[in-house]
Amino acid sequence: VAHWLRDRGFDAYAVTGGVHALLGAPIPEAPPGEGGPRDWKAGAAALRHRRFQIYFGGVLLSLAGSWVEAGAFGYVVLLLGGSAAMLGIIGFLNTIPNLLFALPAGVLADHFDRRKILLLFQGGNMGVAIALAVLWATGGLTVFLMGLLAFIGGSLGALSFPAFQSMLAGTVPPKDLESAVALNSLALQVARFVGPAIAGVLLASVGPTWVFGVNAVSFLGVLGALVLLPSSRAKIASVSVGVRGAMADGIRYVFGQRSLASLMVLMVFAGMFATPPVAFMVPGLVRFQLHEGPETLGILISLIGLGSVLGSVALLVLARRPNKGEPGLVCYLLCAAAIAIIGLSTSVPLSFALALIGGFTGVVFIGLSTVVVQAASSEEMRSRAMAIWAAALVGVLPIGALITAALTAWLGAGGAVAVDGAITLLGGLGVLLWRPEVRWLGCAALPEACVAATDPASFAYLEEEVEAARAA
């Protein structure tokens, strides 16, 4: 009954209303604005705002170009004579900046004009793409230069991320923030799904120079959008405490909120143990666990991408729910279970189904977590909060990749993926037991009955609710 009420908008009254309904008493009505249907039109509400339209168009074009390049990058490394191990090293160089620079980037975005920061760093990324195109066309590109440019590009991306996320929040009023985040996620997943396919066509028809050139041109979209958008700066007078002090303030701010602290622990488990199997181990699973070839690999990767796109569409509705904790936690646990089972699976149809489920649930969890952090953070702390979120999810990926590599050497590809999924699942269950209030992430205020349910010493409150309902 509580779930039935919650699904119809009575989130803040699910427990109390459930008790009343069970005993036949009148059900308390939710105040205006706390309930009601969440339809698809409301999920796209952010598109009504001109600033978001400009931001969304520029980012979508840039993301498409970035994923076209990402789809071809590893192939170009192999064309230059690089090994499979070198692919891993270059992947490490591209992702380690998220751990090194996330927090300083958050401080930067909280204290300076975010628009100017993004113009500088995105212009730098455009320069990296131009350098790749020119070097390949002139025959000067080497594996060493690919690694160097991968590190530079990863660093510029890590320094841009908090400013991008904070600018996103400034393009819409607070009531449409969930819609903006969901649409931003949809743009990312569509670009991720389509980009590598475009890269394959370009590589086969015109070669790597055009792949890198397309990415360079795509940055004109985001740079043009940034020129049209107004300045975006948090209301902070100066960096009076210094960079280290500002970083420490951000950490205290995030981990001083129990719900955000719990969410960050979940993000670490997701980044360290759930992401490496998807990012690095799919070819190994197909070759050594399923004993299949490139056709199966292509279908499996496509199903992960399709699940991600469908998850982003579902996020348009789910992100507008007052309670984002329950659907987010369910998706986290389902994604972890899918990873664990696919590591043990020898059935191609089962693996296809699990890939679709994993792509869907993973994107929903990450999208809802983004909404929660954005909405729960004050304007002057938002960039640092998102930087910590990025460090927790993406910054730990290189460490997770090393752990997964060690597990693979010991247990094989399937065993490593199964263990990664099991650790992710146990981590989520542990957080749920440690911080039960993680189930109500995103609620403006927990209903008293929910608060009581999180504290074993307060179950007397629920007994009083039952007695009051029975008397009524």
Feature locations, PLM:
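Rhodanese-like catalytic fold shared by cysteine-dependent sulfurtransferases
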Residues: 1-36
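Alpha-helical transmembrane-bundle signature of multi-pass membrane transport and export proteins
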Residues: 36-471
